[in-house]
Amino acid sequence: MLSAQLNDYLAEVGLTATEQQKKQLVDFVGMLNKWNKAFNLTSVRDPEQMLIRHIMDSLVVSPHLKGSRFIDVGTGPGLPGIPLAILNPDKEFVLLDSLGKRIRFQKQVQFELGINNISSIESRVEAYQPKDLFDGVLSRAFASIQDMLHWCHHLPKADGCFYALKGQLSEEEMSQMPAGFVVTDTIELKVPKLDEQRHLLRVIKQD
């Protein structure tokens, strides 16, 4: 059932995946549903809704990624990082979260599904000082873009960018962009079966 729905959703948004990648995505939903009962990893309880609200909501960002090394900040159970890592085996994803139960879940996913391009790190973002900086900083966890830029400003390379996954955009929030940052792209995302606004903002640092 989920496999057929995933095929339809991928076709609807013009994304391609191998049979192995599709199996990994469906198995990820299965693991999320199983662990969620004990560890409360997401408020979404229904696997079909997980496929839409977590898997597809993450994957629609994939065509807009530039670079090869990314960090997903406040990743929770691995969203959007794990679905994006499955679809982009040539890119590297660091998944950052401060809660141990989420990191344990991610590591179990990595082990059971054989995902080799993710690293899970338990840390608060302000305490995390990476040896190598990132092409892209991803997050759908922050309440505001201002918060994201404040807490994550030290993570991208000089020519890297921030990818803020947002729902409805507020003009007030957009007008309060911190000094030294500029929005280069505002992309409306279409998620199958989701009648809610979704946007991706790309933000860069300016000297």
From Swiss-Prot:
The keyword Cytoplasm applies. The keyword rRNA-binding does not apply. SUPFAM superfamilies: S-adenosyl-L-methionine-dependent methyltransferases (SSF53335). Its EC number is 2.1.1.170. Signal peptide: none annotated. S-adenosyl-L-methionine binds at residues 74, 79, 125-126, 140. Keywords: Cytoplasm, Methyltransferase, rRNA processing, S-adenosyl-L-methionine, Transferase. GO terms for cellular component: cytosol. Pfam families: GidB. It catalyses: guanosine(527) in 16S rRNA + S-adenosyl-L-methionine = N(7)-methylguanosine(527) in 16S rRNA + S-adenosyl-L-homocysteine. Belongs to the methyltransferase superfamily. RNA methyltransferase RsmG family. This is Ribosomal RNA small subunit methyltransferase G.
